[in-house]
């Protein structure tokens, strides 16, 4: 399955690169209004006090119907706002929050993500498969 990601500081980009995912699309300020015409999993960081980055929100405004699940990066120093963008997107678009990871993720996070992407069933519908 395609993995769409946004990396404002490079951490999510490093996470995706380390995971070795080949079918990817990186959201940028320049392409955030482009259409993706296939199901995808979104990986994003969290900015400010738990907000969804604006390019991600713009992308979802155009492409939310293909969104299957979300994973989010954050910093545990932000307490309850850690990776909160993932919760926000999960609730707003009724998709599962696959996982949360800190900064660019650990090796264990990479293995977990690859396993979840590899086993993700596109036909599961928009029901919650795991709660964080």
From Swiss-Prot:
NCBIfam families on file: nrdI
Extract the HAMAP family matched here: NrdI (MF_00128)
Please explain the role this protein plays, according to its UniProt record.
Probably involved in ribonucleotide reductase function.
The record ties this protein, via Pfam families, to: Flavodoxin_NdrI
Source taxon at top rank: Bacteria
**Gene3D superfamilies on file:** 3.40.50.360
Protein source organism = Staphylococcus epidermidis (strain ATCC 35984 / DSM 28319 / BCRC 17069 / CCUG 31568 / BM 3577 / RP62A)
**Listed name of the protein:** Protein NrdI
| One GO-annotated biological process of the protein | protein modification process
What family does this chain come from, according to its entry? Belongs to the NrdI family.
One of the record's GO molecular function terms? FMN binding
Organismal lineage:
Bacteria, Bacillati, Bacillota, Bacilli, Bacillales
């Amino acid at each position: 399955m395609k993995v769409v990601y946004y990396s404002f500081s490079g951490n999510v980009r490093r996470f995706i690169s380390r995971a070795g995912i080949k079918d990817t699309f990186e959201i940028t300020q320049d392409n955030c209004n482009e259409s993706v015409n296939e199901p995808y999993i979104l990986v994003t960081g969290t900015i400010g006090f738990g907000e969804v980055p604006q390019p991600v929100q713009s992308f979802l405004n155009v492409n939310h119907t293909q969104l299957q699940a979300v994973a989010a990066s954050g910093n545990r120093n932000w307490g309850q706002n850690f990776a909160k963008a993932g919760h926000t997107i999960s609730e707003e678009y009724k998709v599962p929050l696959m996982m949360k990871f800190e900064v660019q993720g650990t090796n264990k996070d990479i293995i977990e993500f690859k396993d979840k992407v590899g086993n993700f069933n596109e036909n599961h519908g928009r029901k919650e498969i795991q709660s964080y």
